[in-house]
Amino acid sequence: MELASKYNPADVEGKWYQYWLDHKLFSSKPDGREPYTIVIPPPNVTGVLHMGHMLNNTIQDILVRRARMEGKNACWVPGTDHASIATEAKVVNKLAAQGIKKTDLSRDEFLKHAWAWTDEHGGIILKQLRKLGASCDWDRTAFTMDEKRSESVLKVFVDLYNKGLIYRGVRMVNWDPKALTALSDEEVIYKEEHGKLFYLRYKIEGEDGYAVVATTRPETIMGDTAMCINPNDPKNQHLKGKKVIVPLVGRVIPVIEDDYVDIEFGTGCLKVTPAHDVNDYMLGEKYNLPSIDIFNDNGTISEAAGMYIGMDRFDVRKQIEKDLEAAGLLEKTEAYTNKVGYSERTNVVIEPKLSMQWFLKMEHLAQIALEPVMKDDIKFYPAKYKNTYRHWMENIKDWCISRQLWWGHRIPAYFLPEGGYVVAVTDEEALKLAREKTGNPNLKMTDLRQDEDCLDTWFSSWLWPISLFDGINNPGNEEINYYYPTSDLVTGPDIIFFWVARMIMAGYEYEGKMPFKNVYFTGIVRDKLGRKMSKSLGNSPDPLELIEKYGADGVRMGMMLSAPAGNDILFDDALCEQGRNFCNKIWNAFRLVKGWENGMGTIDIPADAHLAVQWFDQRLDAAAVEVADLFSKYRLSEALMLIYKLFWDEFSSWLLEIVKPAYGQPVNGFIYSMTLSAFERLLAMLHPFMPFITEELWQQLREREPGASLMVQPLGEPGEVNEEFLQQFETAKEIISSVRTIRLQKNIALKEPLELQVVGANPVEKMNPVIRKMCNLSAIEVVDAKADGASSFMIGTTEFAVPLGNMIDVDAEIARMEAELKHKEGFLQGVLKKLSNEKFVNNAPAAVIEMERKKQADAESIIQSLKESIASLKNV
């Protein structure tokens, strides 16, 4: 079959992906081989493929494909996350477009809409990953709300509750007024904002004077129940034991004392609003202050405030400023910059709010999860993230796990008619416990009321490495014993606490061991200007359009060339173009080599070609060792670059040029076979990075058995490397490059044969056949002294010379070299001037001084060589 002149990914990618699926090459079942397991960070069902997914899943696929070729039983488990807040928001918006409000529906009616939306959209991103070449075991596709995962979540909730680690209580939480739910601390993003500091006058009861308070939130004065001063603050001693009147509101509140108050902030007087500030809440608890909740769940003012009822909180801030000023109770305002908490999900300002919620105690779980990372039982790549992890774990707070949403795992708590509640996985178990607790055998299920809230989405995904193998429902089953702990986790550092830390906690709590052995943290994908990719900036390309334009292999290569481990990626379409060009280079090299097949003859093995195939075979062995080492350190970008250079610079530019038969001449069968074998080994090394083109060409190389695939071919062990032989060949390459440079400088055509003189002894005599062919030499001669007028160069300590005879215009060459000599002498003077400057030598870094000294040595060497060459030419 004749290959097309140009590689067309569209002809190849769909064909081979379907072939891999048809032959179950992604599938995995427990057997006697060493397992290699990766669980996909489950993308949200609301999601479509973006550049972050592309990077993360390209890396996972590279690791999985490499493991298969190492003979491991590779299992990459895909799945999606139900994403409570994001999905519920999508469904609410869809219903709103149809004129339906969530509040008009029952829970069951709403969930029918949510499931329908999920069924329609939930699999989109996984289908898109196939375009990338992701070799997931699709038969194992899971969903965080499927039956097994849901049962696992409920069992863990009940277990942790029974262990005393889950409790219910009124606490200050982060409230999202748009999503109408509590958030964990980790779901709050703090942004720096330029606002105002308002100085408010609180009249001292029974006196004419005022106490002035500085606040960023004047709209919360309706919830003030105290003023607090620092007992050590000399400027506010006169307020001790007094009472003040809340401006506009008229409420009389006490002045309390606590050294928590910062004397330097504002006036040193603090308004205390226990229902709407975390620190004020703690003061309220300490001094038994009343708590007035002035906000409705949607961020409007509640009836409890007594004024501005129903207005939005930010509208009230504007209005209350005017009202305070009109009443003479606003002393002044100042520009002020502070950090404001935003909901990660809805991007609205969160509201600290007292709320009845469910919490998970974290101290015990954090203790068991910290040491394995700090001791490198679980390795982080890059290791710098260990410090981030430790900081989180040592400053951990209890996890608010309840959400005021319907889409998600409903909390398995059931309230009793007379108060109190029971916790159980099923209705039947709950009823049994309720009858026992109340002593009433006649209780019916309809007498119980299940908690309306659902669990934080992360409460299901923290069990992911265990629940995927059904380890919660069926402890010790064959799959959990075989696949767990998993091998590598590839994820972003932004969810190191949300997900990575919590999976480690769950792993040790429920399996008694780590959930994964290594964590590879990817960087953030940025554009070439260093900006984070986002829809609003319009700088985030559509991954599917990139694949259509450059091919999946081209895009994968572009991503990986710009992806140093753990550092941010500066992505540029030009890198995908480079990847596509590399595909064409591979394609054309294959066409060239296969084109020799019809011209094979029974000629003797050419000495130059024999040396070349021996050399490249050893280069492949050496490269295989280097690539394995880079994979072990997760330096995948460097591994790809090494293979790229091996193919482009050494296979194409050297091996093929040496073994290529002259036009119209046959190729030796042994040389052809060795070249094909080298090509096949290169395809195997490249396959994890570029699976489609490598599979296509591997199948074309020779006849294959039905169902055979490069992706399951063993890489094999590299052979012994003769370092001396490799070094001699490298020296030969340097000689060839130097002779070619002389031809270029002297404008001597390659068809004109030259002689090469070796002064003293030839250190690479064994390589003469290669040097002779690649330089078109009539002779290689060992001499005591080079010929007059010869152009020379040094390789190591050996001098080589090319006698030029009548091939050049001597006068013109002398003039050219004298001009170069003048330039180099001027350059040297500049370097020497810098090195003679004591200030420079005493203050510059050692590396900079060393670089200048190297410039001096190099310039002096070139000047000496030029002077000798000029003198030699003048003797001609």
Curated annotation (Swiss-Prot):
Q: Which reactions fall under this protein's catalytic activity? A: tRNA(Val) + L-valine + ATP = L-valyl-tRNA(Val) + AMP + diphosphate
Function per UniProt: Catalyzes the attachment of valine to tRNA(Val). As ValRS can inadvertently accommodate and process structurally similar amino acids such as threonine, to avoid such errors, it has a 'posttransfer' editing activity that hydrolyzes mischarged Thr-tRNA(Val) in a tRNA-dependent manner.
What organism, scientifically named, is this protein from? Bacteroides fragilis (strain ATCC 25285 / DSM 2151 / CCUG 4856 / JCM 11019 / LMG 10263 / NCTC 9343 / Onslow / VPI 2553 / EN-2)
* Similarity field: Belongs to the class-I aminoacyl-tRNA synthetase family. ValS type 1 subfamily.
User: What is the protein's given name?
Assistant: Valine--tRNA ligase
Pfam families (alphabetical)? Anticodon_1 (PF08264), tRNA-synt_1 (PF00133), Val_tRNA-synt_C (PF10458)
The record places the motif ('HIGH' region) at 43-53
Residues folding into a coiled coil are 805-826, 853-875
Keyword ATP-binding (UniProt): yes
Q: Note the subunit structure.
A: Monomer.
- Any one of the GO BP annotations: valyl-tRNA aminoacylation
Please provide one cellular component term from the Gene Ontology annotations of this protein. cytosol
- For this chain the motif 'KMSKS' region maps to 532-536
* Keyword terms: Aminoacyl-tRNA synthetase, ATP-binding, Coiled coil, Cytoplasm, Ligase, Nucleotide-binding, Protein biosynthesis
Annotated GO molecular function terms are: aminoacyl-tRNA deacylase activity; ATP binding; valine-tRNA ligase activity
Give the top-level enzyme category: ligase
Write the gene name: valS
